[in-house]
Design a protein with these regions (language model features):
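Short internal beta-strands
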Residues: 33-39, 226-233, 263-272
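Non-transmembrane, aqueous-exposed alpha-helical and coiled segments at domain scale
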Residues: 1-7, 22-25, 31-32, 40, ...
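C-terminal functional extensions of proteins
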Residues: 242-333
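Electropositive, gly/pro-rich neighborhoods at or near active sites that engage anionic ligands
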Residues: 38-166, 329-332
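Charged helix-capping and loop-helix junction motifs
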Residues: 210-217, 243-248
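Metallocofactor- and cofactor-centric catalytic cores in central/energy metabolism, strongly enriched
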Residues: 2, 15-18, 26-28, 32-35, ...
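An anion/phosphate-binding loop that grips the pyrophosphate of nucleotide cofactors and donors
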Residues: 193
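A short helix->loop->beta-strand "cap" motif at the edges of active sites that frequently abuts
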Residues: 29-31, 223-227, 262, 300-302
Length: 333
C-alpha cells in the first residue's frame, strides 16, 4: 500500500492522541510523523516517578511510542510489557507501569528525556519522532470562575470527587507555575510541518497546556501548515460540562491569540444510538453539540469537516474515535 508522505505534528495526551497516532501510523510514512507528548502529569505511576526520580512524567511519552511501533506483533508484545503494572511486588516499585519505568530509566541513563526517548526509539525500531512538549518540570494550575486555584493536573482532573464540587464553578484559565523552556525540536517540527493536529482529549489538562509552552503558539501562528482540531465526541465532567463546539473553539482561540489561525475542525457526524447517549448522560457527560454559526464567528476562515469518525466499544461502554477513519479524514484534507 502506498502511504502518504505528509509532515505531520500532533499535540495531545492520553487515549485521544494514542488513537490518532494508531491510525496515522498505518496510512502515513512514520518517518514524517512527529508526536508532541504532554509532560505535566502529576498522578499515578508517572507522578510518582516524577517525584521520586526527578524525571519528567513518562506516561504520555510511553503511549506515543507504543502507538508508533510499526510491527504489529512487536506492538502486541510491547503493549503487554508497557502496560504491565507491578501489583504483585511490595515496596516502592508496586503499582508502577513497567513501560514508565523503562522510559524513566532511559531518561536517567542518557541524562535527559529527549535523549532517553531517542534511545527507546532505537530499541523498538520506531521511525517516527516523539518529543516532550517541554523539558521543564512544571505544575499545571487551573483557576475557576469563583477564584479557586487548583494545582496539579491530577487534582484538576479529580476535582469532581471533592464533596464541595460545584459544576457551575467552571475552569476559566490555566497556566503553569513557572516559565517553561522552549523545546527547540518542537519549534523546528512546527516550522517544517504540512499539518498541525490537536488530538481529542481532556481540553484543559492534556490539550490546551501545549499552547502555554513558551514559543509554541507563536510558532504555530507563524507556520504555513494547516491547523486541524479534532473535536471531542463527549464533554468531560468537571472540565467541559455542557460545552458545545463553539466553547471548545473559544478556548483554542484564546490560547492561540485568535481564531483566524484555525483551518479545520473535524467533527463526528454519524448517528449514535440513544443507548450511548444515555450511558454518557448517566456519567454526567453529553455528546458535544455542534453550533456551526457560532463556530464560524469565532474562526471565520475555518472549514468544518463532518465525517463518520466514531466507534462505540460496547463491552467497555466507551465512545472513541476510530483510528483509521480519523486518519483518513485528516490526510485527505
Amino acid at each position: 500500500m502506498n502511504k502518504y508522505r505528509q509532515k505531520l505534528v500532533t499535540f495531545g495526551g492520553g487515549t485521544g492522541q494514542f488513537h490518532l497516532l494508531d491510525g496515522l501510523r498505518d496510512l502515513n510514512e512514520t518517518s514524517f510523523i512527529t508526536s508532541v507528548a504532554s509532560t505535566w502529569d502529576s498522578g499515578g505511576s508517572s507522578g510518582r516517578l516524577r517525584t521520586e526520580l526527578g524525571v519528567l512524567p513518562p506516561g504520555d511519552i510511553r503511549r506515543c511510542l507504543l502507538a508508533l511501533m510499526e510491527d504489529k506483533e512487536q506492538r502486541k508484545v510491547a503493549q503487554r510489557l508497557f502496560d504491565d503494572r507491578l501489583e504483585e511486588v511490595s515496596g516502592p516499585l508496586r503499582g508502577h507501569s513497567l513501560g514508565n519505568l523503562i522510559t524513566a530509566r532511559l531518561d536517567n541513563i542518557y541524562r535527559g528525556q529527549d535523549r532517553g526517548i531517542d534511545a527507546e526509539r532505537k530499541l523498538f525500531r520506531i521511525n517516527a519522532k516523539v518529543l516532550p512538549a517541554t523539558l521543564t518540570d512544571v505544575e499545571l494550575i487551573a483557576e475557576t470562575s469563583s477564584g479557586l486555584k487548583i494545582s496539579g493536573e491530577t487534582n484538576i482532573d479529580y476535582r469532581v470527587k471533592d464533596k464541595d464540587f460545584d459544576p457551575k464553578d467552571k475552569i476559566v484559565r490555566i497556566y503553569f507555575d513557572s516559565r517553561t523552556d522552549t523545546n527547540e525540536k518542537v519549534i523546528e517540527s512546527i516550522r517544517d510541518a504540512h499539518k498541525l493536529i490537536f488530538s481529542p482529549g481532556d481540553l484543559y489538562t492534556s490539550i490546551l497546556p501545549h499552547l502555554l509552552v513558551d514559543g509554541v503558539s507563536e510558532a504555530i501562528n507563524k507556520s504555513k501548515a494547516k491547523l486541524i482540531i479534532v473535536l471531542n465526541l463527549a464533554t468531560k465532567k468537571g472540565e467541559t460540562d455542557n460545552f458545545k463546539a463553539s466553547d471548545y473553539l473559544k478556548a483554542f482561540s484564546f490560547y492561540l491569540g485568535g481564531g483566524n489561525r484555525i483551518d479545520y475542525l473535524i467533527i463526528n457526524d454519524n448517528h449514535l444510538d440513544a443507548e450511548i447517549v444515555e450511558t454518557y448522560r448517566n456519567e454526567g457527560q453529553n455528546l458535544v453539540e455542534i453550533d456551526e454559526e457560532k463556530c464560524i464567528k469565532i474562526a471565520p476562515k475555518m472549514k468544518i469537516i463532518k465525517k463518520d469518525v466514531a466507534m462505540y466499544l460496547k463491552n467497555d461502554h466507551l465512545l472513541r474515535h476510530d483510528p483509521v477513519k480519523l486518519a483518513e479524514a485528516i490526510l485527505s484534507l
